[in-house]
């Protein structure tokens, strides 16, 4: 069986992630692979940018960086997003496995 190629890569000190977001989840967590993206479940509703703000706060905490270092590049209004994380201090276990670190 061929494993899917997940879109997570490094550009120097920047980590780039392609995500599939599940809003209104029971808890915040990085669920793992979802096709060629990483599924992230968050508790915030997809209303008035609440989910995006919550996602940035959650990922900043998970990667040990300031919120200003998490940049939403694509997908502001949809579930499919691309984010850049500048100089992550730590990698969540799910992401580390995908990068084979």
Curated annotation (Swiss-Prot):
Gene3D superfamilies the record matches: YggU-like
One of the record's GO cellular component terms: cytoplasm
SUPFAM superfamilies: YggU-like
Pfam families xref list: DUF167
PANTHER family in alphabetical order: UPF0235 PROTEIN C15ORF40
Similarity comment text for this entry: Belongs to the UPF0235 family.
Name of the protein described by the UniProt record: UPF0235 protein SG2030
Species name: Sodalis glossinidius (strain morsitans)
């Amino acid at each position: 069986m061929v494993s899917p190629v997940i879109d997570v890569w490094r550009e120097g000190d920047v980590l780039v992630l392609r995500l599939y977001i599940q809003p209104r989840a029971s808890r915040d967590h990085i669920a793992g692979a979802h096709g060629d993206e990483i599924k992230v479940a968050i508790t915030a509703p997809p209303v008035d940018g609440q989910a995006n703000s919550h996602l940035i706060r959650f990922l900043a905490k998970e990667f040990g960086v300031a919120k200003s270092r998490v940049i939403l590049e694509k997908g502001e209004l949809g579930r499919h997003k691309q984010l850049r994380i500048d100089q992550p201090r730590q990698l969540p276990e799910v992401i580390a496995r995908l990068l084979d670190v």
